Structure formats: structure tokens, C-alpha cells
């Protein structure tokens, strides 16, 4: 009789074997994902800490035969304390983002997945240069990941004097990649990131030596998110156990509820404990599994909790959304809205939406859809996303005045939450959650109504212009009558007065109507009136 052999593997080994789970499914996707992870970290190190971001992205081909590319991303953020660097880049699932506040990343995986992918196809380590704010030194690291142990391997660590008071982080990775297939997605990612962060500046140099610079348009940075306590609706049995273990010493369960959760005060705590049949003074360490299960069940069914706090969220804001849309698309109309906070499964979320219409936007069979989650542009897996579903399937755009078969329309939706329901660890599409889907539709309906008002008023103005332009052709007759009235019977004076009045009336009318039609002007000037 044969026996099965059982073994365990580390998180690093798991993601090395399954890179597609983190978005590293092929050489093109790996290059895009690496740029994305590094840029997200750079933005979290800057705008979250009220620093105007200056971000450099440089991609170079260093080994044409093996198709090895060098990716470098540098920011002017808060920097990383040197004792944190090894684990931050060399230990999978080690992160500063396991807190209840909105962050661009959420799994403690991103850059480590890029390092793992890098190690699979070439020998160079990840290179990190960093200096925390007010640090007197700049630190240099060369690192790899010990896949079996899920621990960093420090190959080099040095430091130099920080003579210019620089602060920030520069990360360099080498990886097997496909620039030609990744190029469009990377350009799209950088552009869409800039649309919602016009307070940042981006310098991007690609392997073909093309350089793009997106300049900073404003000094206004969105309010950063704050860390909050968990909401009772979002708890489970294991979370309660973890919170109890984390406490330095046992405390009465009543105090535990009041001090460790939002939306629970003295009265609410007493009600919960009464419903769960638990004594107020029982110590947390004395709770049995059955009692914890009972407590969680009561908390989930309790109806009187206040909604989760939105302090943990950071919206883009209507002004910045409109500024970004106008700067990239140059539309004739742009509008945005930020909805009020809502919650799903105990997690707060806010939906923002923006619309740009007309102007320089190219007509297309479907709206151009810009999807964002926690200020991250979502580029891949578009049609599996709930945002795409609402924009293309649930919105009847003709109801809002858009009658073109190929409308010049851009629709932007941003979801921010302490827990975005991504479909996978690759973080490229948002799952269908009823509460979120409803808010997306309501947000789009809000901005679409503003677009409808604009289109309706524009059409009325155009109709009025057409009627008034018809009346313009009477200017010569009116000028003739006024000339006869003003100067009497002197033909020479009548002719001069007629020409002068005709030009003045024509100029006033054209300016008033904002008509720029040279052919119409000539037609009016050459109009033959009855002999003066």
C-alpha cells in the first residue's frame, strides 16, 4: 500500500509557483505589473503623507538576447527606515498595509511578487536606494528572496552621507519581459494615473528612448486616509480571537467592545452582551469558542450600529477629477460627483464618477471607460468588472441626450474602500457586490443628468443661433433704412453711412452669436439692396 507524502511550502514558494495569481502571467503582463506595483508604492509614500509626488519611471533593455529589461522607479516620498527594507522587499506578505484604512496595495505581495518573478529568469538582485525624511544618510541595498524560508537574502548593504537632504526611494528590478506587447498598457497606466493625480508630476522614459513628461497642474492633494477601528459588521470569529491575543493583558469583554470597535458605546455594549448572554465583567481570555461565536452572531445581526466611519477613506474629489479629464481629453463638457459614504459587509466605501463629452474626444461605438479602485487605474480584465457592466449594460445613455451611434464620451468611476472586492490578487477588476453596483449606477445617473442638461441647453442655443443667423441676412436692408433716416437724400453720404452701419451691425451680431462663418459674412456684405 502506497502512502502520500505531505509537505508545506512558504508563501514565497507558493507565489513563485503561481505567479499568475499576482498578475505575472506572461512577460508582457509581468513588465506592466512591475511598473504598476512600483508606482503605487511611490504614490503611497508621497500623497498619503501630504507630499506632492515627483515620480520617475525608466525602462531600459539591458540584454537584447535574453530580453532582460531594467525597470527603475524613483519617488520623493517619506523613504523607508533601513531596518525595514529587507523584509519590505524580501518577505512575502510583509506589509505596512494590513490596517483599516484605504491603501493602493492590500496584500503585502506586490513588489515581492515582482522580485520573485525577477529571480526566476535572471540572476541580478533587486536594488533599493532610500533615505527617510530628515535622515543624514542614504542607504543602498541589494536583495534576493530565499524562496524556501520566505526570508530576505541581503547581498549588500551600504550607506553614504546625505549631502543634499534627499528623501525618497529608488527601486531597480531586472526582469525577462516583452516591451512591445506591454507598451500600450504601460502608457495607458501612466496616463490614467495622471488623470486622477494632477497634483503629481511624472517623468517616463521607455526602452525606445521616448520621453513623456506630465507636469503638475495643482498643489491640491486629497485628504489622506486615517486608520480606524474595525466596524462590528465586518468582524468574524478569527478576527475577534486575533484582537484578544494582541492585547497586552486580559480586559473585561465590555471594555474590549467599547475600546476596540467603532460605533460601540456604553449602552450599545450592554445591549450586545445581554443579547449574547455574556457577563459584562468576564475577561476576554476566558471566552470560549462557543461564546465568541455567539458574540459575533449578535454583532452581525444588531441593527442599531452607526455606519462605518469614512475617515479611513481618501477620495480624489470633484475638482481634481474634472481637472484631470480636461487636461488629457480636452472636452467641451466635464463634470464629476463624489457620493456620500456607504458600507458593505462592515467596510465603508465611496463611489466617485466623472464624465467628459465632446471637444477633442474621438467618437467610438462604446464610451471610453476609466476604472479606478483606491486611486489605482484598472487596465486589464475590463469586461469582467462591475464598473464596465454598469456603464455599458445598465446605463441607457440615450435617456441623457446622447443620440450619436458613436458618442465622444469618456466615463470615469472610482471606488475607494478599506476592502475593495477584487476578483483576484492581480487587482484588475472589481467583483459584483450589490451595494457597490447600486452606488456606481446612482453616481453615473447624477453626472449623466448634468450632461443631459448641458446637451439640452446646447441644442436650444444652436436652434436659436440658426434662427438668428437667418435674420442676419436682413442687416443690409436695416442698414439701408437707417442710413436714409440719418443722412437724408445725399447719395454719397448715404452710401458711406450704409457701409459703416452694415459693418458695425454685422460685427455686433456675429460676436453676440459667437458665429465664425466667413462665407456667411461675405454673403451679407455682397447682398444687393435696392439702389440707394
Predicted segment positions?
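Conserved short strand/loop->alpha-helix "switch" segment adjacent to the catalytic nucleotide/phosphoryl-transfer site
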Residues: 14-36
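Conserved ATP-binding N-box helix of the HATPase_c
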Residues: 28-57, 110-117
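Short beta-strand-loop-beta element adjacent to the nucleotide/active-site pocket used for signaling
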Residues: 60-71
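Short helix N-cap motif at coil->helix boundaries in the Bergerat
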Residues: 79-87, 114
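Helix-hairpin-helix
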Residues: 254-276
Amino acid at each position: 500500500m502506497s502512502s502520500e507524502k505531505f509537505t508545506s511550502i512558504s508563501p514565497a514558494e507558493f507565489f513563485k509557483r503561481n505567479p499568475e495569481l499576482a498578475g505575472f502571467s506572461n512577460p508582457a503582463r509581468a513588465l506592466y505589473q512591475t511598473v504598476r506595483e512600483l508606482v503605487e508604492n511611490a504614490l503611497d509614500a508621497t500623497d498619503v503623507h501630504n507630499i506632492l509626488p515627483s515620480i520617475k519611471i525608466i525602462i531600459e533593455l539591458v540584454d537584447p538576447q535574453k530580453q532582460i529589461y531594467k525597470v527603475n522607479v524613483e519617488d520623493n516620498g517619506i523613504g523607508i527606515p533601513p531596518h525595514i527594507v529587507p523584509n519590505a522587499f524580501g518577505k512575502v506578505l510583509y506589509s505596512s498595509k494590513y490596517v483599516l484604512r484605504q491603501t493602493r496595495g492590500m496584500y503585502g505581495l506586490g513588489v515581492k511578487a515582482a522580485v520573485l518573478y525577477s529571480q526566476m529568469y535572471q540572476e541580478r538582485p533587486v536594488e533599493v536606494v532610500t533615505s527617510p525624511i530628515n535622515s543624514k544618510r542614504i542607504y543602498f541595498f541589494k536583495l534576493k528572496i530565499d524562496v524556501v524560508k520566505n526570508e530576505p537574502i541581503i547581498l549588500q548593504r551600504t550607506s553614504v552621507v546625505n549631502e543634499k537632504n534627499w528623501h525618497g526611494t529608488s527601486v531597480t528590478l531586472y526582469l525577462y519581459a516583452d516591451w512591445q506587447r506591454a507598451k500600450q498598457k504601460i502608457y495607458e497606466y501612466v496616463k490614467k494615473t495622471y488623470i486622477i493625480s494632477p497634483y503629481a508630476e511624472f517623468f517616463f522614459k521607455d526602452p525606445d528612448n521616448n520621453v513623456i513628461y506630465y507636469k503638475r497642474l495643482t498643489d491640491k492633494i486629497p485628504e489622506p486616509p486615517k486608520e480606524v477601528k474595525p466596524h462590528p459588521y465586518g468582524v468574524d470569529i478569527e478576527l475577534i480571537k486575533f484582537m484578544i491575543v494582541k492585547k497586552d493583558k486580559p480586559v473585561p469583554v465590555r471594555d474590549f467592545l467599547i475600546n476596540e470597535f467603532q460605533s460601540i458605546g456604553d449602552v450599545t455594549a450592554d445591549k450586545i452582551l445581554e443579547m449574547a448572554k455574556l457577563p459584562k465583567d468576564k475577561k476576554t481570555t476566558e471566552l470560549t469558542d462557543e461564546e465568541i461565536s455567539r458574540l459575533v452572531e449578535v454583532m452581525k445581526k444588531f441593527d442599531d450600529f452607526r455606519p462605518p466611519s469614512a475617515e479611513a477613506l481618501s477620495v480624489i474629489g470633484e475638482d481634481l477629477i474634472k481637472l484631470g479629464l480636461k487636461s488629457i481629453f480636452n472636452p467641451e463638457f466635464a463634470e464629476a460627483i463624489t457620493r456620500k459614504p456607504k458600507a458593505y459587509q462592515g467596510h465603508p466605501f465611496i463611489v466617485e464618477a466623472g464624465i467628459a463629452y465632446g471637444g477633442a474626444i474621438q467618437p467610438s461605438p462604446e464610451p471610453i471607460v476609466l476604472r479606478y479602485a483606491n486611486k489605482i487605474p484598472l487596465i486589464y480584465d475590463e469586461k469582467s468588472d462591475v464598473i464596465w457592466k454598469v456603464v455599458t449594460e445598465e446605463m441607457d445613455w440615450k435617456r441623457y441626450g446622447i443620440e450619436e451611434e458613436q458618442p465622444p464620451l469618456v466615463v470615469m468611476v472610482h471606488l475607494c474602500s478599506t476592502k475593495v472586492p477584487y476578483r483576484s490578487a492581480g487587482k484588475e477588476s472589481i467583483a459584483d457586490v450589490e451595494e457597490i453596483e447600486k452606488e456606481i449606477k446612482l453616481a453615473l445617473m447624477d453626472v449623466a443628468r448634468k450632461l443631459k442638461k448641458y446637451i439640452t441647453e446646447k441644442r436650444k442655443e444652436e436652434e436659436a443661433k440658426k434662427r438668428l443667423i437667418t435674420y442676419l441676412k436682413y442687416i443690409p436692408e436695416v442698414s439701408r433704412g437707417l442710413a436714409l433716416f440719418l443722412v437724408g437724400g445725399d447719395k454719397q453720404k448715404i452710401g458711406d453711412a450704409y457701409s459703416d452701419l452694415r459693418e458695425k451691425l454685422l460685427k455686433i451680431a456675429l460676436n453676440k452669436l459667437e458665429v465664425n462663418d466667413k462665407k456667411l459674412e461675405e454673403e451679407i456684405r455682397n447682398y444687393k439692396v435696392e439702389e440707394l
